[in-house]
Amino acid sequence: MTASAVLDLVKDLIARPSVTPDDVDCQMLLAQRLERIGFQCETIARGGVTNLWARRGAGAPLTVFAGHTDVVPPGPRDKWDSDPFVPTERDGFLYGRGAADMKSSIAAFVVAAEEFVAAHPEHPGSIALLITSDEEGPAVDGTVIVCDELRQRGEQLDYCIVGEPTSTEALGDVCKNGRRGSLSGRLLVKGVQGHVAYPHLARNPVHQLAPALTELVAIEWDQGNEYFPPTTFQVSNLHAGTGATNVVPGEAVALFNFRFSTASTPGQLKARVHEVLDRHGLEYQLDWELGGEPFLTPRGSLTDALVSAIQAETGLQAELSTTGGTSDGRFIARICPQVIEFGPCNATIHKVNERIELSSLAPLKNIYRRTLENLLLAD
């Protein structure tokens, strides 16, 4: 198949305005293609979210491609040089919402699977795709529930490639063999409201909170390790008061987030925060939300297969990285021992005029196909 096969499918997907969590039949289009080459396709839907599980073969190893058909809203349409849902070729790029994140990856893998099956119809092992329309949104009815379903069935995943746009300067320069965890907190410090002229009759929660936050910001939570940078603590929001300058507020709220490595656990981070707050004598309420545990795939079969495929196709030696935000890889890592993320350049994702280089579509497809060959056809 030529590069046009990938391009045609990408265009079909971009033309469907699948703003999260609406799939707009993107997955139906994929299922029709996959069923023609022997995949068994199943829709798992909940809460307005559409998920596709498509599998070909029953044996091991099971290699999975994971992705999402949903996209973020395009923002002001008048800021785009062309309609975000009318795929447009211009100056060597394909423009449209989802072009880089991540409809090109999905199209490239589907065509790669078609080529692989055509060349190896009796291939060993199994190939599957896990596609959701709830990655850009709350991510509560998407990949996570499919993983729960697969666990309950006893389906054993061996390898998973998540098609996130990981490349930075050139296709193949970076892939992600892990991600940091995310732990958020909402801290409410209680005071006593009063008149600023009579501070002895009030208790200012801002004054109480400030030294505690200063201490938390200064803490070295860990030193990271060979795979992850040190854990970070960032205050993202502060709120107190009525807007008046003559009223001592009755409460103060701080929102904060940890991005943490495998060098720390959520329990350790929580305990240390509580120790600081208690030592400062605060009257407080602290609510926690664990966005995801960190995961890591050390060098092994999957990383070697992908890095080798990238080098064969592009000549680049891919860097293994764990930087960036969270992804659905955090859910898949619970049921799959080896997870890696790889896709096109990410410079324009979530931006106006999102785009992908047309010349990268065929190499992306070839890298996915070569990775399948390395994993399933190796002696």
From Swiss-Prot:
Keywords: Amino-acid biosynthesis, Cobalt, Diaminopimelate biosynthesis, Hydrolase, Lysine biosynthesis, Metal-binding, Zinc. Its EC number is 3.5.1.18. Homodimer. One of its GO terms (molecular function) is succinyl-diaminopimelate desuccinylase activity. The active site is at 70, 135 (proton acceptor). GO terms for biological process: diaminopimelate biosynthetic process; L-arginine biosynthetic process; lysine biosynthetic process via diaminopimelate. It comes from Bordetella bronchiseptica (strain ATCC BAA-588 / NCTC 13252 / RB50) (Alcaligenes bronchisepticus). This is Succinyl-diaminopimelate desuccinylase. Its cofactor is Zn(2+); Co(2+). Binds 2 Zn(2+) or Co(2+) ions per subunit. It comes from the Bacteria. It catalyses: N-succinyl-(2S,6S)-2,6-diaminopimelate + H2O = (2S,6S)-2,6-diaminopimelate + succinate. Pathway: Amino-acid biosynthesis; L-lysine biosynthesis via DAP pathway; LL-2,6-diaminopimelate from (S)-tetrahydrodipicolinate (succinylase route): step 3/3. Zn(2+) 2 binds at residues 101, 136, 350. Belongs to the peptidase M20A family. DapE subfamily. Catalyzes the hydrolysis of N-succinyl-L,L-diaminopimelic acid (SDAP), forming succinate and LL-2,6-diaminopimelate (DAP), an intermediate involved in the bacterial biosynthesis of lysine and meso-diaminopimelic acid, an essential component of bacterial cell walls. Zn(2+) 1 binds at residues 68, 101, 164. PANTHER family: ACETYLORNITHINE DEACETYLASE, N-ACETYL-L-CITRULLINE DEACETYLASE. It is an enzyme of class 3 (hydrolase). InterPro entries: Bact_exopeptidase_dim_dom, DapE_proteobac, Peptidase_M20, Peptidase_M20_dimer, Peptidase_M20A.
